[in-house]
């Protein structure tokens, strides 16, 4: 109940920011129906295969990196360890905080006697809690959410780069984003994957001048990380 009470003013705040953002971009009720759907004809059958290839490639890289990480943990251990023990080893950096917030909630989890309201935003925590209804293990559920969000985010990056440049640049953007050494964080129990998804989608719709969709994705970005608010506020 405490988490719900805390979440209500946060959601209301971002709704107000979204409304102000839409007004600043000149969105009226009459134009709202044109804000999400593109005015030009769109061939879904031609677009979806490329998106699925991009999604599959990005997800495949994340799976390979995770398998390699778990394998290294297994061979580096002096005793026999299970898969769940290996997943528990992923409690590194901020992942430990997110895992505790997912399991205990914002009201129950404290560090040095203080709550972590201002640093760790709730969107990722909410998503993983939903997935935990199907996959009880927090580390596995969190890693799955991160990998899927990253893969979907790569689709938006590919679309934005394709429309801004060409297919070669779009393919390279996804490739380098996926294999960059620090891309390991996109598959951990942290917000990097979800933040990529929300910001890339918001920027794509800003590029297309679809301000309602831009505002919605921007609000999710703001609920994911503190700097996500910069996506929502109009320039």
What are these regions (language model features)?
Residues 2-80:
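Start-transfer (signal-anchor) and selected internal transmembrane alpha helices
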Residues 89-136:
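Short hydrophobic/aromatic helix or loop-helix immediately within or flanking a transmembrane segment
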Residues 116-117, 142-150, 191, 203-204, ...:
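Alpha-helical transmembrane segments of multi-pass integral membrane proteins
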Residues 119-120, 124, 128-132, 136, ...:
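Transmembrane alpha-helices of multi-pass, membrane-embedded glycan-processing enzymes
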Residues 137-142, 152, 157-179:
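Transmembrane-helix signature of polytopic, membrane-embedded enzymes
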Residues 165-168, 202-213:
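Membrane-interface transmembrane helices that cradle and orient dolichyl/undecaprenyl
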Residues 187-194:
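Short acidic/glycine- and proline-prone juxtamembrane loop motifs at membrane-interface regions
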Residues 196-197, 213-222, 227-235:
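Transmembrane-embedded, aromatic-rich helix segments that form part
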